[in-house]
C-alpha cells in the first residue's frame, strides 16, 4: 500500500512538472498576430501588406533584403554596429535617394530582446543619411521577434507605422524621435 502511494505521488509530481514546463514554453514564445517569418522574403511580403492602400501617398519605393553578415550595410540600414543579433533584415526606401524615407523590418535571433534592438536602432540610426534631406519623424517598436522602424516626414511615416501596429496586434515599447530643425537667421 505504501509503495502505491509513493508511486502515485511521484507520477503526480512528474505530471505537474510537465504541465509547468509546457506553460512556461507557451508563455515564453513571443506574442504577435504577425505571420511567422521563416525567410527574409517573408519580411518583404509583410512590407507589401503594410503598404496596401497607401501606394499613392508614398514615394516610389524599392524593397531589398540586407545581408546580416555585411556590417557596413547593417550600420547604414539599421544603425546597429553589426547583424549578430539579427536573423533577417528588409529595407524599403525610395528609388531616388533625395527623398527621406526608410522602413526597416528585422527579425531578431532566438533569445534576443526585440524591444531592446528597436530602442538601439532608434537611438543609433542616421536620420540624415540622404542627400540634403533628413527624416522629420522616427517611429520604432517590436512585436514578438520582429522590429519595425520607419522614418520620414509625418505624412509618410505615421500611416505605415500605424499599419504595422494594426497588423501586429500586440507591440512592445514604442520609441519616437522628432528631428529638430536648425534655427534660421532672421532676414536682414
Which role fits each region the language model picked out?
Residues 2-102, 108-188:
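Soluble, non-membrane globular domain cores that form compact, hydrophobic packing
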